[in-house]
A protein has these predicted regions:
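Active-site helix of classical SDR
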Residues: 125, 161
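Conserved glycine-rich cofactor-binding loop
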Residues: 7, 14-16
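Short C-terminal tail/terminal secondary-structure segment
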Residues: 94, 99, 150, 230, ...
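Alpha-helical segment proximal to the catalytic Tyr-Lys
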Residues: 130, 173-178
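Short, small/polar-rich loop/turn modules that mediate ligand/substrate recognition or access, typified
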Residues: 177-181, 239-241
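Residue(s) in the substrate-gating loop at a strand-loop-helix junction
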Residues: 145
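Substrate-binding pocket helix/loop in short-chain dehydrogenase/reductase
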Residues: 98-102, 106-111, 206, 210
Length: 254
């Protein structure tokens, strides 16, 4: 897909991977709705930076766990941008709970993680389908995780939600074809503020361990993941239903 004069929604775009993706799209001439749930200042800053590339960029608040908010998000894209070609389902959440501590996992953990990480992408895709089709077809990219492939990560509910998202990606690719392609990226450890806050003092030792484990001896940055997302958007039109690991070769080891 050629991105110039196209339009995109990126959820959770105030920080991290979402921010990097919104800016990468804008740099290539794609207007963008910069969605956020709580990170208003970050989203508005991202929108300003994206607009500096000469495209239209609008920050829009919506909690993807709420179906009505997802529909309002797509309506904003139609109102502000006039079309929709790309949906990047990046918004996500987790809890940092040791896997062996089963008693610490409560209903709220399951409900919130699945509401954002699984229902959110489904609801956004469902809401976006008509506008994507009216715009000539398009692309949905879900931001998953290697946690959904190997069941190691911040918590068991998080791993399960990403495994389910991988399955959802394949199901949506089947039912939305041939006009809409659906793929996912599965990052490994992503260096940055989100994991640093969640892991605290354990962040640097875990990061070093992940670097040592990866065949390429480094972990992801948000920009690495954004590049993987764009490779799916702008690459072969025959790729759909694919989950692309982006983890420096952690899955194959050194």
């Amino acid at each position: 897909m050629e991105l110039k004069h196209k339009a995109a929604i990126v959820t959770g775009a105030g920080t991290g991977v979402g921010r990097a993706t919104a800016l990468a799209l804008a740099e290539r001439g794609c207007s963008v709705i910069v969605n956020y749930s709580r990170s208003r200042e970050g989203a508005e800053a991202t929108a300003r930076e994206a607009a500096a590339f000469g495209v239209k960029a609008v920050a829009f608040q919506a909690d993807v766990a709420d179906d009505g908010a997802c529909r309002a998000l797509v309506a904003a894209a139609e109102r502000e941008l006039g079309r929709l070609d790309v949906l990047v389902n990046n918004a996500g959440t987790t809890r940092f709970i040791p896997h062996a501590d089963l008693e610490r996992v409560g209903d709220d953990d399951w409900n919130q993680i699945f509401a954002v990480n699984l229902k959110g992408p489904f609801q956004c895709a469902r809401a976006a389908r008509p506008l994507l089709e009216r715009s000539g077809g398009g692309m949905i990219v879900n931001v998953s995780s290697v946690a959904g492939l190997v069941a190691t990560g911040s918590s068991i509910p998080y791993c399960a939600s990403k495994a389910a998202l991988n399955n959802l990606t394949i199901a949506l690719a089947r039912v939305l074809a041939p006009r809409i392609r659906v793929n996912a990226v599965a990052p490994g450890f992503i260096a940055g503020e989100w994991l640093a806050q969640g892991l605290g003092a354990a962040y640097e030792p875990i990061k070093q361990a992940m670097e040592a484990r990866a065949a390429l001896h480094r972990v992801c940055t948000p920009q690495d993941v954004a590049a993987a997302i764009l490779s799916l958007v702008t690459g072969s039109d025959l790729v759909t239903g694919h989950v692309l690991p982006c983890e420096g070769g952690m899955l194959i080891g050194s």
